[in-house]
């Protein structure tokens, strides 16, 4: 299991974990967010959320 907390400024660290499953950050209402492709579809990752990759390689987001 691997995890990384999104800080709003660590896109390269998130990209290293998620590869092409994550889209470039975007700015909305004063915050930076990401979109992450999971088995359930695209999920918005907000600053302070934690992205988790389980032992099967699947991603989910913890708030």
Model-predicted regions and their roles:
Residues 1-39:
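N-terminal non-globular leader segments, chiefly Sec-dependent signal peptides
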Residues 40-63:
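Short, compact, well-ordered microdomains
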């Amino acid at each position: 299991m691997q995890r990384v907390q999104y800080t709003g400024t660590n896109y390269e660290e998130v990209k290293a974990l998620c590869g092409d499953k994550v889209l470039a950050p975007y700015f909305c209402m004063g915050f930076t967010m990401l979109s992450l492709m999971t088995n359930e579809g695209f999920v918005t990752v907000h600053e302070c959320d934690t992205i988790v990759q389980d032992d099967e390689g699947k991603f989910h987001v913890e708030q």
